[in-house]
């Protein structure tokens, strides 16, 4: 490809609405252009990268035994009503009607469609296991699209769905897909981690997320220092402190704490460490048969954060987690939120493991502007339950029993689930087993955010000059930069020679044949992030050499004219 025949579309300035580095660089490198909120046009450079990612995904899915299909983006509402997700899904599900006033959705995912397909096409255990996938456009009406293609409304996704006679078969395919995902992200040259994860709105049992590690990541990942254990903070278990709880040494005392409502204010006023204080949060419980929802108290150490996912999984706690209103708080505790304590509450009390290990702690007095000191479990507070309801923190013991936890930020680019029979049972997707009896199929689903992978790769691979692509997903492998080629016949001839030889060797090469200053050409190619550069000039030709530059390291070397093609091939074959 020649730049004179190409839509390069680079920008010198960063658009004001681009927050994260991947969004900034994708706009500046001429990869994407915004059409509307959360909607982007992919320009030639971006599309080349997107196609590279898709090709790797497709190859590894095929190797893993999955079969490619293509399903409609527009889906009939009746399928979502059949699965029960028509009511469960929020406003991010884009609902529409056709000219006959029939309801449809723009598909954010395809569990319903693929289940409807398989229940008609598969009727015998002999046809299982079956793993179908597609690489296709999805639409989720995000309330606040941001970060460019990282969280857009329209995006490209690889979604696969497997069907099985039993759980054992599902687990086997799940393992194959886990390995396929590791292969995919390794081939892209990404630093990633598979982590234990929550199943979220998709449902099911076992689940892993795949995260590209990056400081800009929205998710926090917990890793063991001495094992392969890794989990999303939402799922990482916070173990109970070792040893026995200390014995009480103080008497319970009520102390005035005027204008001290937060943990920081209370600990500063009483001159105690935050980890010696408790905070009590009141949340709504599930509705009873009369439609009434009670209140449940969740108690944590003052320096710890509530894990809402863990809290939602406690029997009786309403999901999604909803905090009690001011009126409900006063009815249960007799005070405002900043003064609640776990003692004498007329509701169920659930205490985090670390909080339950404290002695002589500080907590609210259930009276405005007062707190209790010297409080102790069982002596001063009775009738409580103990559970893991907090986020882990760095330095906590690893749940695997080896080492302690480190925390890093990650960008979720893939998610795999063992769905079980959630959709197949709801939609009556059965096959006949060996005895001729109808059996509900077990299902798995496996997603990769293809467009998000492109952005995540940039978040992990950039410098102050632009993107640094790995060879496997770069828009071009090599760029030829001939200085003053329109004034030097021999520079032009050598550039054309290299261009033709590299093309003949199957190398994806870009020849920058614009009438531009060398500084502009260098800046554009570093911004785009092409891994390998060949710089040709009259002076270097006089010395029988050209300059080779490796984008990632910035190293420059002079290479003999007759050896540069062999060097490029060797670099690409590493």
Curated annotation (Swiss-Prot):
CDD domains on file: ProRS-INS, ProRS_anticodon_short, ProRS_core_prok
Q: What terms describe the molecular function in GO for this protein?
A: aminoacyl-tRNA deacylase activity; ATP binding; proline-tRNA ligase activity
Which EC number applies? 6.1.1.15
Concerning Pfam families, the annotation shows: HGTP_anticodon, tRNA-synt_2b, tRNA_edit
Alphabetized, the UniProt keywords read: Aminoacyl-tRNA synthetase, ATP-binding, Cytoplasm, Ligase, Nucleotide-binding, Protein biosynthesis
A Gene Ontology CC term for this entry?
cytosol
Q: Is Transmembrane given among the entry's keywords? A: no
Q: What role is this protein assigned?
A: Catalyzes the attachment of proline to tRNA(Pro) in a two-step reaction: proline is first activated by ATP to form Pro-AMP and then transferred to the acceptor end of tRNA(Pro). As ProRS can inadvertently accommodate and process non-cognate amino acids such as alanine and cysteine, to avoid such errors it has two additional distinct editing activities against alanine. One activity is designated as 'pretransfer' editing and involves the tRNA(Pro)-independent hydrolysis of activated Ala-AMP.
On assembly, the entry states: Homodimer.
Q: What is known of its domains?
A: Consists of three domains: the N-terminal catalytic domain, the editing domain and the C-terminal anticodon-binding domain.
Q: Which family does it belong to?
A: Belongs to the class-II aminoacyl-tRNA synthetase family. ProS type 1 subfamily.
User: Can you say what this protein is called?
Assistant: Proline--tRNA ligase
Say which species the protein is native to.
Tolumonas auensis (strain DSM 9187 / NBRC 110442 / TA 4)
